[in-house]
Amino acid sequence: MTDRNISLTYAGAGVDIDAGNRLVDLIKPMVRATARAGAEAEIGGFGGLFDLKAAGFADPVLVAANDGVGTKVKIAIETGIHDTIGIDLVAMSVNDLVVQGAEPLFFLDYFACGKLDPETAAAIVAGIAEGCREAGCALIGGETAEMPGLYKDGDYDLAGFAVGAAERGSLLPGRDIAAGDAVIGLASSGVHSNGYSLVRNIVEASGIALSAPAPFAPVATLGGALLTPTRLYVKSCLRAIRETGAVKGLAHITGGGFTDNIPRVLPEGLGVRIDLAGLTVLPVFKWLAQQGRVVEREMLRTFNCGIGMVAIVRRDAVQQVVDVLTQAGERVSLLGDVIVAGDEGRVVYDGQLDLAV
């Protein structure tokens, strides 16, 4: 029972305002480094500001997205590696913006924890700032919530919010997607940020410690390899859209894999035929499939399997688009074609994934 003669405090309840102020001081230079046309990227006010006119748009449509990184944060917590999970947070939202033809403009984050450690939180924000710089968007604000009793000490969760813009009339997917268009894939960097509940189950069943060498990448620890950041496709895809005029649609391959994500950008009545032999399956996916005895269908519905972004491209401009994407640093594969959807479903697979280790 609480002694009624004792004066209770917020700090005594587990919330340290001074730690929050120290965090703000630590991250101000990181945030400032994300400044871009339209935003000075200063924090400390009650709201973030963005000047849309200064960003150079004439008749813009705003596009918004928000996402998290799922249970990938648990691996960051267990390994103590916190400086890359913020990149994932940015990538998950801004990749969804570029799918609609939008240029990311600004980003806000939400960080919730049981007990605030300013240095850990600053490492996370450093990753967020790095992701924002790579995507060309400003980090204009965020929220840090210290919630003792809701989260255990050391645990945290993240959410991100991104806003972008596209000129009216240039939004994707285009209405001209048609049977015969080409389907190309942009390589992923790894598992990205989906499927980690299954990944963690497989790791636990394997008995391999996160600090041990990764069986599929011996130069890295298992935990470090699984924390490889989600690839950001923003600048390369925007370049392909603007320079070629031949990109009709984009699909960010997240939870649901090809099976659920590609149909989201296709007109009713159309599907795609994918040649699985055209996929370069990354070693991490081969290991997960073998170690977890995960069947091909489940792999394709859960993971990106080596392709993080799919583009629907005008057939006569495939090489032009591939050249632009390659020059922008992407590894590109020809995956298949847009087809008239039939009884087989909207995503038809030919061949098999190469899951042999």
From Swiss-Prot:
GO cellular component: cytosol
Pfam families the record matches: AIRS (PF00586), AIRS_C (PF02769)
GO molecular function, one term: phosphoribosylamine-glycine ligase activity
Keywords assigned: ATP-binding, Cytoplasm, Ligase, Nucleotide-binding, Purine biosynthesis
GO BP: any one term: 'de novo' IMP biosynthetic process
InterPro entries reported in the protein's UniProt record: PurM-like_C_dom, PurM-like_C_sf, PurM-like_N, PurM-like_N_sf, PurM_cligase
Main location: cytoplasm
Catalytic activity: 2-formamido-N(1)-(5-O-phospho-beta-D-ribosyl)acetamidine + ATP = 5-amino-1-(5-phospho-beta-D-ribosyl)imidazole + ADP + phosphate + H(+)
Keyword Transferase: no
EC numbers: 6.3.3.1
Keyword Repeat tagged: no
Location within or outside the cell: Cytoplasm
Family, as annotated: Belongs to the AIR synthase family.
Name used for this protein in its record: Phosphoribosylformylglycinamidine cyclo-ligase
Organism: Nitrobacter winogradskyi (strain ATCC 25391 / DSM 10237 / CIP 104748 / NCIMB 11846 / Nb-255)
Gene behind the chain: purM
